[in-house]
């Protein structure tokens, strides 16, 4: 084995030299130079500095403006709440541990940080699944006259939380475990060992299949059918130009969110899968650290995409920041009236 396994950790370095120590008790500067740990701390500070204001602002503006409280926006706000969980439950912890060079909060702190990081990522993924299904049902119309209403949105939010908990909670109760990963300053699911006493192998397979592959398959199925339907509708002029434009803009925004999610999380999932399927292989701490920390940037992109691509929200945000007045004088009257076929109650205004 090219790593050192302890009771609650796995350090990606052989202990033949005798330098490996518990990441809960000693600085891990034998894994990487101290400046690299400082760089990780600075990176996490940047994510906190950007992630908290932009997510909190998105949440606050939506609460302040009643016209933004549409059913589809409930799902988008669910993404924001997931991001805030990651910022408070994960980023602050990881920044402090990186500053110290090891996981100073101990095993319990590792479980808490790993839980919030996993929960936030899974809520985001399952929220994107709900958005994809909503877009598919609304645009492709497999069920005629379906209207995505408030009850559907609430069920979608509840579903995303149930599925996320089904992924993040089992390690807390003995099915798999959370351990430090990479440079040992952040925690995640144990992909490094089979650990038969906690049935780790079965959990990792369950997680990859149920909480990664299946959601992505649903998303790709929905958008694959959706793209074909939009092209066909445009060719046959089945909907009004305004309706087609609104549906395309909403769909484009959600697709960009999906692409951003894949960019952030697929490298991490790929590396984790490689490590799991190549037990004992030789890899350095940086190999897992870079994709793990890159995945954390996902807490920023959803609200940014929402702000950039939603003109109605931008106007509301400017009005809120300017104490009730929009200096640009660009109140989007059409945004509040955007008509999307069979789904006027779930509208998200186009940019």
From Swiss-Prot:
Location of Phosphoserine modifications: 341
Glycosylation sites: 2, 15
Sites annotated Plays an important role in the conformation switch to the active conformation: 113
Any GO molecular function: protein homodimerization activity
Residues exposed to the Extracellular side: 1-36, 97-110, 174-202, 275-286
One Gene Ontology CC term in the entry: membrane
Transmembrane segments: 37-61, 74-96, 111-133, 153-173, 203-224, 253-274, 287-308
Record membrane topology: Multi-pass membrane protein
Topological domain spans for side Cytoplasmic: 62-73, 134-152, 225-252, 309-351
PROSITE patterns: G_PROTEIN_RECEP_F1_1, G_PROTEIN_RECEP_F1_2, OPSIN
Positions of modified residues (N6-(retinylidene)lysine): 296
InterPro entries associated with the record: GPCR_opsins, GPCR_Rhodpsn, GPCR_Rhodpsn_7TM, Opsin, Retinal_BS, Rhodopsin, Rhodopsin_N
Annotated Pfam families: 7tm_1 (PF00001), Rhodopsin_N (PF10413)
Region (Disordered): 331-351
Motif 'Ionic lock' involved in activated form stabilization, residue range(s) on this chain: 134-136
Annotated disulfide bonds: 110-187
Gene3D superfamilies from the UniProt entry: Rhodopsin 7-helix transmembrane proteins (1.20.1070.10)
Keywords recorded for this protein, A-Z: Cell projection, Chromophore, Disulfide bond, G-protein coupled receptor, Glycoprotein, Lipoprotein, Membrane, Palmitate, Phosphoprotein, Photoreceptor protein, Receptor, Retinal protein, Sensory transduction, Transducer, Transmembrane, Transmembrane helix, Vision
Cell compartments where the protein resides: Membrane; Cell projection, Cilium, Photoreceptor outer segment
UniProt record similarity statement: Belongs to the G-protein coupled receptor 1 family. Opsin subfamily.
Protein name: Rhodopsin
Organism of provenance: Gallus gallus (Chicken)
Taxon lineage: Eukaryota, Metazoa, Chordata, Craniata, Vertebrata
Gene: RHO
């Amino acid at each position: 084995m090219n790593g050192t396994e302890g009771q609650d950790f796995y350090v990606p370095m052989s202990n033949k030299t005798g330098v490996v120590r518990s990441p809960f008790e000693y600085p891990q500067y034998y894994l990487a130079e101290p400046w690299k740990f400082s760089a990780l701390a600075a990176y996490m500070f940047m994510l906190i500095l950007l992630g908290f204001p932009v997510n909190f602002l998105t949440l606050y503006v939506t609460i302040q403006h009643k016209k933004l409280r549409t059913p589809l926006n409930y799902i988008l706000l669910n993404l924001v709440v997931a991001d805030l969980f990651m910022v408070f439950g994960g980023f602050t912890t990881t920044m402090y541990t990186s500053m110290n060079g090891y996981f100073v909060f101990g095993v319990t702190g590792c479980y808490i940080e790993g839980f919030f990081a996993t929960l936030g990522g899974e809520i985001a993924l399952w929220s994107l699944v709900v958005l994809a299904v909503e877009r598919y049902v609304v645009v492709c119309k497999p069920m005629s006259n379906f209207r995505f209403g408030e009850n559907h949105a609430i069920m979608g939010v509840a579903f995303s939380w149930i599925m996320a908990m089904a992924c993040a909670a089992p390690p807390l109760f003995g099915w798999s475990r959370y351990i430090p990963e990479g440079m040992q300053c952040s925690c995640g699911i144990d992909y490094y060992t089979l650990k038969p006493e906690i049935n780790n192998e079965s959990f990792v397979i369950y997680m990859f299949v149920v909480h990664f592959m299946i959601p992505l398959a649903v998303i790709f199925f929905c958008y694959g059918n959706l793209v074909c339907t939009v092209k066909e509708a445009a060719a046959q002029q089945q909907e009004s130009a305004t309706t087609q434009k609104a549906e395309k803009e909403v769909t484009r925004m959600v697709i960009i969110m999906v692409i951003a999610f894949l960019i952030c999380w697929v490298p991490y999932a790929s590396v984790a899968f490689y490590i799991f399927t190549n037990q004992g292989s030789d890899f350095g701490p940086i190999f897992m650290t870079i994709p793990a920390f890159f995945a954390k940037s996902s807490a920023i992109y959803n609200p940014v995409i929402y702000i950039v691509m939603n003109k109605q929200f931008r106007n509301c945000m400017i009005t809120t920041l300017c104490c009730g007045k929009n200096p640009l004088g660009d109140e989007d009257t059409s945004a509040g009236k955007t008509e999307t076929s069979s789904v006027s109650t779930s509208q998200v205004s186009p940019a």
